Regions:
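Extended, small-residue-rich solenoid/repeat segments and analogous flexible loops
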Residues: 1-63, 67-69, 75
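Intrinsically disordered, low-complexity terminal regions
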Residues: 4, 122-129
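Thr-biased low-complexity repeat/linker tracts and other Thr-enriched repetitive architectures
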Residues: 44-123
């Protein structure tokens, strides 16, 4: 029998990721080289690849991508068609949604929300306290 997990939207077939032990829906794609922490969740059709990290209570869902050496941590939420790539970090209670992109060495943290078609790149830091 396939394990199921409730990601907050009902139970779906899921499994624990071998690198970190976090929950990954069977519909999501996560590389073995990525780290999914024990309380982190990846579901929907999300993609986490390369050496990306999803830690703490962070969530990556829908069609979102996290790649490269990017990190999503705290209670951060990455969803929609959002992309977090390269060495970018999303942390705290921040969210990156819709078609937003965070890449380069950019940081999005605290309670910041990046959405729509926004781009955060280079060494930019977006926070809201």
């Amino acid at each position: 029998m396939t394990p199921i997990f409730d990601f907050g939207f009902g139970f779906v077939p899921a499994h624990r990721h071998p690198n970190g032990g976090g929950w990954v829906a069977d519909t999501a794609r996560v590389a073995d080289t990525a780290y999914i922490g024990p309380a982190a969740r990846v579901f929907g059709a999300a993609l986490v690849r390369d050496n990306a990290v999803v830690a703490d209570n962070a969530v990556v869902t829908d069609y979102a991508w996290v790649s490269g050496n990017a990190q999503v941590s705290g209670k951060a939420w990455v969803s929609g068609n959002a992309v977090v790539a390269e060495n970018a970090q999303v942390y705290g209670n921040a969210s990156v949604t819709d078609n937003a992109r965070v890449y380069g060495n950019a940081w999005v943290g605290c309670d910041a929300k990046v959405s729509g078609n926004a781009r955060v790149s280079g060494n930019a830091e977006v926070t809201k306290h």
